[in-house]
């Protein structure tokens, strides 16, 4: 083991001097044993001359002093992988943070791994049912694909992710890995306790590097979660789900570290390596011929500006986008998915079939027509519309309300039982509304229900 000494500390960045000829390699993990016996992990980022390296700390550097001894492990950060991590909560370096003792796995993986080889990739396109009407109908997720949940602050990204974890664990009994990247610790705590209550925790591994942690941890924790998911894909040939909340914080942490590492900032103050860092992470999230990693990533949009470099870079990697809209949330329609702004690569008649494709296009068409008529309604009122347009508006408002749905994870807030709606039920419901089969029902009957039969039942009580 090579030993060095701390020469300078600037916030989360620590410079370490090593004897000549013993410099650690880039991305090697170093560790310091603090006076209280705890270990602090550093990751080598730059070589400054022949004897000094610049590193980024994975935990707070409070209490470190110059001259402390630093040990080079000779390899990158290694995290435990395998079925033993299911039901556990880990930090960025793979240490348990749930107070349930050590995680004893037979294997460890480096958090920095190569993307699968080109010939190993699978190109099969198939839909992945989530049980959430608006997603399954209008922007279907693909198995082994990447989906982005875009939204500003407080429109429901985390609730939607929690619902997806719940539905997938219960309906499809798949394994999930959740990486909490730079989000609120309270939300992570809520998620953990809700998972324990619902029993979903047994099929999920949780990895957290939250807002209160230094940028090194927030920049690397998504990679930790990804390595755990890759093990299930490559060694156990499973289809795994990887949830990242929030991918924007991954970029944000990179930009915090970048200036301290002496790099020139690029557009809007982001790091010049933004596209490379994002590419290295996203390229590993893929399907091979053995198994798949399907990822759902929440993407915070700063100031609701989709052209900001961070969300814009993430866009390029996605197969489907679910855009959450504040204007829809203000109508009380949850999930607040914007049906006209959200897209999916696999909404194609060759993949999902003609029936699904045509219904989705009809829904989008009627909602777009309603949107076009809204200016006229605002100025002249409903009475000035032709009979045909009045019918379009009436059906569009029913469609809009039918796109809402009660969630299992929100039962405590809504007082309504959660609903999982199968794809054929979803298609059937929207086809009937558009065909005018339910023109006589009040629009409130369609709000926060599951299937069309429930809407008909609800109408009887109104």
UniProtKB/Swiss-Prot annotation:
PROSITE patterns given in the database record: ATPASE_ALPHA_BETA
One function term, GO molecular function aspect: ATP hydrolysis activity
InterPro entries reported for this sequence: AAA+_ATPase (IPR003593), ATP-synt_VA_C (IPR055190), ATP_synth_F1_bsu (IPR005722), ATPase_a/bsu_AS (IPR020003), ATPase_alpha/beta_chains (IPR050053), ATPase_F1/V1/A1_a/bsu_N (IPR004100), ATPase_F1/V1/A1_a/bsu_N_sf (IPR036121), ATPase_F1/V1/A1_a/bsu_nucl-bd (IPR000194)
Keywords: ATP synthesis, ATP-binding, Cell inner membrane, Cell membrane, CF(1), Hydrogen ion transport, Ion transport, Membrane, Nucleotide-binding, Translocase, Transport
E.C. code: 7.1.2.2
Residues annotated for ATP binding in this entry: 151-158
Localisation: Cell inner membrane
The keyword Lipid biosynthesis appears for this protein: no
Broad EC category: translocase
Catalytic activity: ATP + H2O + 4 H(+)(in) = ADP + phosphate + 5 H(+)(out)
Bilayer disposition of the protein: Peripheral membrane protein
Summary of the function given for this chain in its UniProt record: Produces ATP from ADP in the presence of a proton gradient across the membrane. The catalytic sites are hosted primarily by the beta subunits.
Subunit structure: F-type ATPases have 2 components, CF(1) - the catalytic core - and CF(0) - the membrane proton channel. CF(1) has five subunits: alpha(3), beta(3), gamma(1), delta(1), epsilon(1). CF(0) has four main subunits: a(1), b(1), b'(1) and c(9-12).
UniProt family annotation: Belongs to the ATPase alpha/beta chains family.
Name of the featured protein: ATP synthase subunit beta
Protein's gene: atpD
